Amino acid sequence: MRKIIIGSRRSQLALTQTEWVISKLKEAGAPFDFEIKKIITKGDQILDVTLSKVGGKGLFVKEIEQAMANKEIDIAVHSMKDVPSVLQEGFALGATTTRVDPRDALISNEGYTLAELPAGSIVGTSSLRRSAQILAKRPDLEVKWIRGNIETRLRKLKEEDFDAIILAAAGLERMGWSNEIVTEYLDPDLCVPAVGQGALGIECRADDDEVLEMLKTINDDTTAKTVLAERTFLHRMEGGCQVPIAGYATLTDEGEIELTALVGTPDGEQIFKEILRGKDPVQLGETMAQALMDQGAKEVLEQVKKGLESQ
């Protein structure tokens, strides 16, 4: 019997997600043994600066893809929001799992919601997307960068000078912590989620037919379709650098995809937001990108990138 080696980052969340995928594959009747290989990524090692300054989200994927290319591992489980919008040649996205809660979650020391936080309160996030949207709603707040895994960020909220932090609800849910600690879930209308947020992406070698066949059993068609619209938009807009960009798609009762997309400046002073519907996910993502570019969003992203590079 073939043994499938699954590469995972070493954080508790990454391992929990990987174990969940193994359980789903076994439930679906996968005729293989499974083993987890822990991999340290560059993104896990550099914790003192924002992701955008050190190469963006691909930092969490590069070492794992290298291990796959070397055949040290067969598949990798990623949080979909960390997967670059275009995969390297030779790799394939074998499955997109059913999306769980896509929202951002606010956790505050005093139990204040976003609307209730006193002026001057310090909100911790590692995301320019969240920063742009939070400051657009509450320009009287201060955003400070916070890095590290969930446990580290929760500790920093208690020990350092943060009044609140914002994390992805999905990670908290997977760890079984959301009910205890979340002050407020931010509705997607208020804070548009990251592309792919709440879904897992399972990557494998493009020529591994046996694994590709196995992964089909846990692919969720609705999530795959909506995430494809989001990822197409992301690719057309900027292709992977970590910038203030958001995209969230749902399937309507009529079977259409509704895509909400947003581009902004990190200080929240300029926000471009659009909601469009369509049948074809790729076409919808491309149409959305063009709509925001026509409003001037591309120039804003270029300015943001230049600003980040000069810091």
From Swiss-Prot:
Gene3D superfamilies: Periplasmic binding protein-like II, Porphobilinogen deaminase, C-terminal domain. One of its GO terms (biological process) is protoporphyrinogen IX biosynthetic process. Its EC number is 2.5.1.61. The keyword Transferase applies. It catalyses: 4 porphobilinogen + H2O = hydroxymethylbilane + 4 NH4(+). InterPro entries: HemC (IPR000860), Porphobilin_deaminase_cofac_BS (IPR022419), Porphobilin_deaminase_N (IPR022417), Porphobilinogen_deaminase_C (IPR022418), Porphobilinogen_deaminase_C_sf (IPR036803). The keyword Transferase applies. One of its GO terms (cellular component) is cytoplasm. Its cofactor is dipyrromethane. Keywords: Porphyrin biosynthesis, Transferase. Pathway: Porphyrin-containing compound metabolism; protoporphyrin-IX biosynthesis; coproporphyrinogen-III from 5-aminolevulinate: step 2/4. The modification S-(dipyrrolylmethanemethyl)cysteine is found at residue 241. CDD domains: PBP2_EcHMBS_like (cd13646). One of its GO terms (molecular function) is hydroxymethylbilane synthase activity. Binds 1 dipyrromethane group covalently. Pfam families: Porphobil_deam, Porphobil_deamC. It comes from the Bacteria. HAMAP family: Porphobil_deam. Monomer. Belongs to the HMBS family. Tetrapolymerization of the monopyrrole PBG into the hydroxymethylbilane pre-uroporphyrinogen in several discrete steps. This is Porphobilinogen deaminase. It comes from Halalkalibacterium halodurans (strain ATCC BAA-125 / DSM 18197 / FERM 7344 / JCM 9153 / C-125). The lineage of its organism: Bacteria, Bacillati, Bacillota, Bacilli, Bacillales. The gene is hemC.
